[in-house]
Design a protein with these regions (language model features):
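Nucleotide-activated donor-binding/catalytic signature segment of Leloir-type glycosyltransferases, i.e.
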Residues: 279-301
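Acceptor-binding helix/loop patch of EC 2.4 sugar-transfer enzymes
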Residues: 78-97, 140-183
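Short hydrophobic beta-strand element within catalytic cores of glycosyltransferases
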Residues: 332-335
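Aromatic "clamp/platform" in nucleotide-sugar-dependent glycosyltransferases that forms part
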Residues: 315
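Short alpha-helical donor nucleotide-sugar binding micro-motif in glycosyltransferases
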Residues: 189, 294, 302-307
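Conserved donor-binding/catalytic core segment of Leloir-type glycosyltransferases
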Residues: 221, 229-251, 257-262, 270
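Conserved acidic donor-binding segment of nucleotide-sugar-dependent glycosyltransferases
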Residues: 347-348, 352-359, 368-373
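A short, well-ordered alpha-helix in the C-terminal region of glycosyltransferases
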Residues: 361, 368, 375-389, 401
């Protein structure tokens, strides 16, 4: 039985924070191995205001500071280099990459795991940050979270997309990983004792040798803000449509732009996100809509409440957190099965589930909501209701249960 957990992640995304909260609440968190932690940053007041906010976002309230094992140097260099590289391109060549940060984190996690090893220890690692840790000869359970679908399946789908939409091919960065990185991904899955995934979609992409070690623990929705102002467009005004995410073709952007163009004055599209890489069709598409490159999280949630519907026609995900956020703000969602959210985006109730690459599907769903504002309001109410039932608390409970059922999973797979 797991009595101690060491968790390793360089950035502390929303799902990571919830896993930390679960292990803390369960009294089993041994340590959290990370890069930058505001709790350990001594020069915060000396930083420029914008950079200070970036560091403050790397705060982990609720986790005792002595359990946080941070090493900020490389990640600080990456953040500074990324900012300066916009105006001084030469700096990019000496700026650590995200992949290098992951590798360093993995090596540090392996060291902490070796020091604390024992039959009651589980090490909780993530894709791209587990290879060295899981290769260790020391005794501990190797728990692996795969937050997005299996890489071979993603490559298959994105290679298809490259052929279908060649003008968007430069934005398909998922095809850029080299053979060494892909081999590490494969070995991580092979060495894992148990694999946790956030959706049935992710599990469905895994080959049987990995899927039999898999357990679905769905990420939850943010807390629903009771009484938060929510506006709807009048029936004689265009439907306000929102997209938020990285701006590349993996998110199905070309299909969204085409469907909105077909609908003309019936809809108004707002796009929030940073381009993966600019290409001509993306520039043209953004020129025809309202584009916001980035927003603080609280402002994004407020923006959601000012729109009527959220569209996320992604080709490949794990479990799209932005969809869960949209539901929590009362937005019906139009998305694909590959978003990993079909348990909460219920077709005809809280939104529409359409096939990938379906311009017709997006168009028909938007047109129905534009013409039937009562249906829109009903779906909004249902979205809030379902979001409140699919909380992060339920995720934390399920995660702790999965950790304690590890021995059962192992016996099945032997």
């Amino acid at each position: 039985m797991t009595k101690r957990v060491i968790l390793g992640h360089p950035f502390g995304n929303a799902n990571v924070r919830q896993a930390l909260a679960a292990f803390t609440e369960g009294g089993i968190l041994e340590s959290f191995v990370t890069t930058l932690s505001a709790e350990h940053f001594r020069m915060l007041s000396l930083l420029p205001a914008s950079f200070r906010k970036e560091v403050q976002r790397r705060s982990f309230p609720g986790v005792s500071s002595d359990r946080i094992k941070s090493s900020a140097g490389q990640e600080l260099m990456r953040l500074v280099g990324t900012r300066l590289g916009r105006s001084v391109p030469k700096i990019r060549s000496v700026t650590p990459s995200v992949d290098e940060v992951w590798k360093s984190l993995d090596l540090r996690l392996a060291s902490y795991a070796a020091q604390a090893s024992g039959a009651d220890l589980s090490v909780y690692a993530y894709e791209d940050g587990a290879f060295h840790t899981f290769s260790s000869p020391h005794t501990f359970r190797r728990i692996y979270e795969l937050p997005i679908g299996y890489w071979r399946e993603m490559h298959r789908l994105l290679e298809e997309e490259r052929d279908l939409q060649p003008e968007w091919s430069s934005t398909l960065k998922g095809l850029a990983d080299g053979p060494e990185k892909l081999e590490r991904k494969e070995r991580e899955l092979q060495m894992a004792d148990a694999i946790l995934v956030p959706s049935d979609f992710v599990l469905s992409t895994l080959p049987q040798e990995f899927a039999r070690k898999g357990t679905v623990v769905p990420y939850g929705c943010p807390e629903v803000s009771v009484g938060a102002p929510r506006s709807f467009s009048p029936g004689n005004k265009p439907l306000k449509v929102l997209f938020c995410g990285s701006l590349g073709q993996r998110k199905g952007l070309s299909y969204l732009f085409e469907s909105v163009a077909r609908l003309g004055s019936q809809v108004e599209l707002t796009v929030v996100g940073t381009p993966v890489e600019l290409c001509r069709p993306l520039e043209v598409g953004l020129s025809k809509v309202k584009w916001i490159s980035s927003l603080p999280h609280a402002e994004l949630l407020a923006l959601m409440r000012q729109h009527d519907v959220f569209v996320f026609p992604t080709l490949f995900e794990g479990r799209a957190l932005v969809v869960l956020e949209a539901l929590s703000q009362g937005l019906p969602v139009i998305t694909t099965p590959n978003s990993g959210t079909t348990d909460v985006v219920l077709h005809g109730r809280t939104g529409y589930v359409i096939p990938i690459r379906s311009v017709d599907g997006i168009e028909m769903a938007l047109e129905e909501l534009a013409k039937d504002r009562e249906l829109l309001r009903h779906m909004s109410d249902e979205a809030l209701k379902l979001a409140s039932e699919t909380s992060w608390l339920s995720y934390r409970v399920k995660l702790l249960n999965a950790m304690q059922n590890f021995e059962f999973i192992k016996q099945i797979n032997q």
